[in-house]
């Protein structure tokens, strides 16, 4: 009599496949990295303040000092935007993330360009500086609007980049109060606003690193 062989029943005691870590967990920033980034931003800001405050002779070439200050400040801004981008401050939407990527690229690219400035022809450098300065400030302002609008970060670090980028309000206020002849006062207000705002932002990264890391 013929017999029919049936396949053995499937095993139910097989160990489960290990779960693959989520991509978001792999991208999460640790509080230590955020604190280190904040400390690096502070160091670069100190370089910016030092070389901006150094007295330069009227008949000397002050470009080197201005260049070092510009590189240091652009790099400090790039660190903040890089942490915000990696830490999820721009959210998951493509539009604001594209803004963050573009701002970081503009800031990092400007820092690299200004770093090689002394070896470039002077005419080319002067023309490029007319583009890089508004590009850096404009890119940072747009990124700061994104951080504030998306709202993934909480606490001072959410609003401080936007306050830093709002330097025209301070400069215009100084001019309105003191008159159009206060060019030097307006310049000091501009530099002071940028330095103070960026310093507070870097301190916020250090002090609030744990909460910022939880949003990444």
Residue ranges and their predicted role:
Residues 2-9, 13-216:
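Hydrophobic, aromatic-enriched alpha-helical segments typical of multi-pass transmembrane helices
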């Amino acid at each position: 009599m013929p017999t029919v062989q049936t396949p053995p029943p499937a095993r139910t005691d097989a160990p489960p496949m290990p779960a693959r870590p989520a991509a978001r967990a792999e991208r999460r920033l640790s509080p230590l990295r955020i604190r280190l980034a904040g400390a690096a931003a502070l160091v670069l800001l100190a370089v910016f303040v030092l070389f901006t405050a150094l007295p330069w002779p009227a008949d000397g070439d002050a470009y080197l000092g201005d260049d070092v200050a510009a590189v240091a400040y652009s790099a400090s801004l790039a660190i903040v935007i890089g942490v915000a981008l990696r830490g999820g401050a721009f959210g998951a939407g493509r539009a604001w993330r594209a803004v963050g990527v573009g701002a970081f690229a503009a800031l990092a690219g400007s820092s690299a360009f200004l770093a090689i400035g002394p070896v470039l022809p002077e005419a080319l450098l002067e023309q490029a500086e007319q583009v890089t300065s508004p590009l850096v400030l404009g890119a940072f302002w747009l990124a700061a609007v994104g951080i504030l609008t998306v709202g993934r970060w909480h606490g001072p670090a959410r609003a401080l980049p936007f306050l830093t980028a709002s330097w025209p309000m301070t400069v215009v206020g100084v001019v309105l109060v003191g008159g159009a002849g206060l060019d030097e006062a307006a310049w000091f207000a501009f530099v002071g606003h940028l330095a103070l705002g960026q310093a507070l932002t870097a301190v916020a990264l250090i002090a609030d690193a744990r909460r910022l890391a939880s949003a990444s």
